[in-house]
């Protein structure tokens, strides 16, 4: 006689539970480890999530990516056999939470262990590992100090960066490398740029205060919030009163335009998406801005930002290094008075906002980026008017992309005169800005 056994139904986790958020965060973490950027990985993993669950999964995923080096090292000590990818990633997320517990106890340790086991038990393909998961996490809690000391000798575990990244920063900044790595592992502040065409800085600060949001003036039009909030809660955001932009990035537009920008001046914002610097240029002066972006999927963001701010630019699609192929018939041959060359780079200076960058980048990416930056610089220089200025900008802290590039450009372009500029800006723990680099050249 044959007995037909129906498969046990798969448990459904409440969307408000930590177990549910752990599943979604683990899915995103798996994608990051396969090479996908964290925002895209989260978008895929949380498509069907209600907003509170999406926010919880996002918080977990960002924590997990920031602690990926130490969590991987811990798991290698705690579990010898290879784990299923989903079991591994739920445990990595749980270990990140437990490591953060001392300084930021988002959940009790008991809750983390219990809900991690629930997340594993709720999936048919992983349920067999629930006992192992329970044992692994409880052992970590019992032996935390010993285990953390055991992995501390591994640079990737100690600093939560790839070894090549640590070596690069240490070589470039022998006296500051530890502070730089720590700063990159922190959470950056939420900084606003006030659109003074719509409202003064003092008025905006007062409106924020009335809405229960404390802020500090940290630049000519920069307000740093004491606590980050969703943008839709910002007074006047939909009406273009403010934009979210790091204080370091807010240096670009004033550097491009100078103290007395001429009305109608032709300005090229190369590599313009999502349009933050384009908007700032137009907020500051009545200039003609061409916003160029090579990735057509990012161009809608430029239009969205300009529409919200009530501003307009000539938006083009194309590679900054091939002006003849820009959309709209290519460059029209009329030289630009100012060019902002915010070139593709490693993004090593904004790692505290994008912690996945450290794990997605490879050491051999840097020479390729350096070559691309040089190609773009040379091409854009040919579109600059005599007497005009080009600002070279990156969001990197690696000297090969920054000062080395500025010195190279001075050597190969004898018609380039280097002018004063901020140079290298470094992030610091609790600092007001991310890592940026600015160099300025005038064409003679």
Mark where each language-model region is.
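S-adenosylmethionine
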Residues: 1-444
């Amino acid at each position: 006689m044959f007995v037909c056994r129906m498969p046990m139904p798969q448990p459904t986790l409440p969307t408000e539970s930590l177990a549910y958020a752990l599943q979604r965060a683990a899915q995103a973490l798996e994608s990051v480890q396969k090479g996908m950027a964290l925002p895209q990985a989260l978008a895929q993993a949380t498509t069907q999530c209600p907003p509170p669950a999406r926010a919880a999964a996002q918080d977990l995923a960002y924590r997990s990516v920031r602690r990926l080096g130490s969590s991987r090292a811990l798991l290698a000590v705690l579990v010898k056999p290879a784990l299923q990818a989903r079991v591994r990633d739920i445990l990595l997320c749980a270990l990140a939470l437990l490591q953060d517990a001392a300084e930021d106890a988002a959940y009790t340790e008991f809750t983390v262990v219990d809900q991690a086991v629930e997340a594993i038990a709720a999936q048919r393909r992983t349920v067999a590992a629930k006992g192992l998961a329970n044992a692994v996490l409880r052992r970590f809690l019992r032996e935390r100090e010993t285990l953390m000391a055991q992995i501390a000798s591994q640079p990737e575990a100690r600093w939560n960066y790839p070894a090549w990244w640590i070596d690069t920063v240490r070589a470039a900044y022998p006296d500051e490398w530890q502070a730089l790595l720590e700063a990159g592992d922190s959470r950056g502040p939420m900084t606003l740029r006030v659109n003074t065409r719509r409202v003064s800085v003092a008025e905006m600060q007062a409106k924020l205060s009335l809405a229960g949001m404390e802020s500090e003036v940290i630049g000519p039009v920069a307000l740093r919030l004491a606590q980050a909030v969703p943008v839709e809660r910002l007074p006047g955001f939909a009406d273009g009163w403010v934009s979210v932009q790091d204080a370091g990035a807010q240096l670009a537009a004033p550097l491009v335009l100078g103290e007395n920008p001429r009305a109608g001046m032709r300005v090229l914002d190369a590599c313009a998406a999502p349009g933050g610097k384009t908007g700032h240029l137009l907020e500051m002066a009545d200039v003609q801005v061409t916003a160029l972006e090579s990735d057509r999927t990012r161009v809608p963001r430029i239009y969205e930002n300009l529409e919200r701010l009530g501003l307009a630019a000539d938006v083009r699609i194309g590679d900054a290094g091939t002006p003849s192929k820009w959309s709209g018939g290519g460059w029209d041959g009329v030289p630009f008075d100012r060019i902002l060359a915010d070139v593709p780079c490693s993004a090593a200076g904004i790692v505290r906002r994008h912690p996945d960058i450290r794990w997605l980048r490879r050491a051999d990416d840097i020479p390729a980026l350096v070559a691309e930056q040089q190609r773009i610089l040379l091409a854009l220089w040919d579109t600059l008017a005599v007497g005009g200025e080009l600002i070279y900008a990156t969001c990197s802290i690696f000297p090969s992309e920054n000062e080395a590039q500025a010195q190279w450009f001075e050597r190969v372009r004898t018609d380039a005169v280097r002018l004063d500029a901020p140079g290298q800006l470094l992030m610091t723990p609790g600092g007001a800005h991310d890592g940026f680099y600015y160099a300025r050249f005038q064409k003679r």
